[in-house]
């Protein structure tokens, strides 16, 4: 597992992972940054997909990003008023990596899913995601540290 200090949108990987909402409306946080960087086509394709449950993942084009795909992993359901649990984050990370396998992708970049707007503690997120990532040694994964708290959480994984 690699560490990148900066936005997930900077990565040259096969897929970047988006901390989405279940409605796939990319209006804030990392989701909005991905659409700004990759273009409106990401939101348009997400609109056609329409929905993704917590703990699941769906792929869309990456527009003009360096990646080939954006894999959307919901961390919040505004309609139902629920935020992702650590189990949802673990299952969503696994679902994203299963999609990587299905699409024959060799690399993926992840923000700390749920550690931003959703407010799940970054250290707990990093640990849940690392557990899932360890199950997919065939996909080279990069965790992105966007904030000081993210950086501390990801670097804490080295102590495991």
Positions of predicted regions on the chain:
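Phosphate/ribose-phosphate-bearing ligand recognition and processing surfaces
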Residues: 77-160
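Glycine-/small-residue-enriched capping loops at alpha/beta junctions
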Residues: 1-86, 90-103
